[in-house]
Design a protein with these regions (language model features):
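Short loop/turn segments that flank or connect secondary-structure elements
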Residues: 1-203
Length: 203
C-alpha cells in the first residue's frame, strides 16, 4: 500500500491520453510559489485583461504580443493572493496545462533550485500501472527521456535543455521506442538515431 504522503497520479495509460488538457490544481500551489515565469499568448485576452500591465514583460524570442509574468521577492506569482490564485477561472493557458506528473512519468526532476515545492510534489506522485500495457508505456517514456539526454549532442537544436520541455518531448515521441510484435506483445526498443530525429521534427 502507498504511504499516506503519496498522491495517486491515476492510471498511466489514461494520463497519457489526457496530456495537454486542463489540469485541476486542487489545493496544490507548488507552481504558484516556485519562482516561475508564466508565458501568456496574445490569444488569451480574457487572462490578459485581468493582469495589471505593469506585471507583464515582452517574452524574449517570441513574436509580438507574447508576454511573460514574473514573480515577487518570495518567488510567488503576483496573482497568488491569500494562499490562492486570484484569477483561477481565468488563469493563463500555461497554468492550465502545466502538469508536474510529466516528471515522474519521464523519470526526471525539475532543473531549477527555486522549485523545491514542485520537486516535493513530484516525489509524491504515484502512477497506477495495473496492466502490462501501462508498464510498457511508462518504460517507453522513460527510455525516450534517457535517450534524449544521452544523445542531445547528436540531435543539435532538437533536444530542449529545459527538463520540463524534455519530459513533454519524451511523452510525445514515446511511440518510436515501442515495437509491436506479430504475437501482439509490445516491447521497448532503442530506435535508430534517424528515427528519433524524424519523430521530433514531425511534432
Amino acid at each position: 500500500m502507498a504511504e499516506p504522503d503519496h498522491l495517486p497520479a491515476g492510471r498511466f495509460s489514461t494520463w497519457l491520453g489526457q496530456v495537454g488538457v486542463d489540469v485541476p490544481c486542487g489545493t496544490c500551489t507548488a507552481c504558484c510559489t516556485s519562482s516561475q515565469f508564466v508565458h501568456i499568448g496574445p490569444d488569451e485576452p480574457d487572462t490578459l485583461s485581468r493582469i495589471p500591465k505593469a506585471l507583464l514583460f515582452v517574452a524574449p524570442g517570441l513574436p509580438r504580443g507574447h508576454v511573460v509574468m514574473g514573480y515577487d521577492e518570495r518567488g510567488h506569482c503576483p496573482m497568488f493572493v491569500d494562499g490562492a490564485c486570484s484569477i483561477y477561472e481565468h488563469r493563463p493557458r500555461t497554468c492550465r496545462t502545466y502538469d508536474c506528473r510529466v516528471f515522474p512519468a519521464a523519470g526526471l526532476e525539475p532543473d531549477h533550485d527555486g522549485r523545491a515545492g514542485i520537486a516535493a510534489q513530484i516525489r509524491r506522485w504515484r502512477f497506477d500501472v495495473p496492466e502490462p500495457d501501462d508498464e510498457v508505456l511508462q518504460a517507453a517514456v522513460r527510455a525516450a527521456a534517457s535517450y534524449l539526454r544521452a544523445n542531445a549532442k547528436l540531435l543539435p537544436g532538437l533536444v530542449p535543455g529545459n527538463s520540463t520541455q524534455l519530459a513533454f518531448l519524451a511523452v510525445g515521441i514515446r511511440e518510436v521506442f515501442l515495437e509491436r510484435l506479430a504475437s501482439g506483445e509490445v516491447r521497448v526498443v532503442t530506435p535508430a538515431l534517424d528515427a528519433v530525429r524524424a519523430a521530433i521534427t514531425r511534432r
